[in-house]
Amino acid sequence: MNNKVFSKTRANPSLAYCYIEECINEPDNKMYRYYHWDSKHKMYSERTLIMDEARLVNYLMYQKPDYLMQLLNECRLYSYVLRKVRAYNKAVDSQTSELCKDDQEMQLALRLGDMDKYAALERSNRHKAEEMLRDSFYAA
């Protein structure tokens, strides 16, 4: 099932200036394609949104469709998504480093040179940070 959300048209009434297409490539694994009309080349430019970008667009599509339409109509969706994902990743990195700094088990693994255990604990702390900050990711 592919859903498409179109922006209001600009000069040509039969042509949407921006639109987003939902693509399901595996069960529970969505990706989105964002199309933006390039008037210089007279064709659409396409961006594929996956992972965090797709998660944010999915949230907007099903929880805040009016805001999604506003972003599409203003042709700001792609820049909005990139800005939110960058801010989220920066916050997750910062929170992960704070968690790692206070983790005694990680410090011990580092002193003993057990890099496999250190990497596993770091991934675990990153996952904790992502879970802690997920709600702020969706706040508009």
Predicted regions and their residues:
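Extracellular/luminal domains of secretory-pathway glycoproteins
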Residues: 2, 16, 20, 25, ...
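Extended, Lys/Arg-enriched charged tracts that mediate electrostatic binding to polyanionic substrates
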Residues: 3-5, 9-14
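N-terminal leader/targeting segments
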Residues: 14-15, 57
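Short N-terminal mixed-charge amphipathic segments
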Residues: 22-77
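Short runs of predominantly hydrophobic/aromatic residues within well-ordered alpha helices
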Residues: 53-56, 81, 85, 122-126, ...
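Aromatic-anchored, charged helix-turn/loop surface patch used as a conserved interaction hotspot
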Residues: 60-62, 66-114
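C-terminal charged interaction modules
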Residues: 101-140
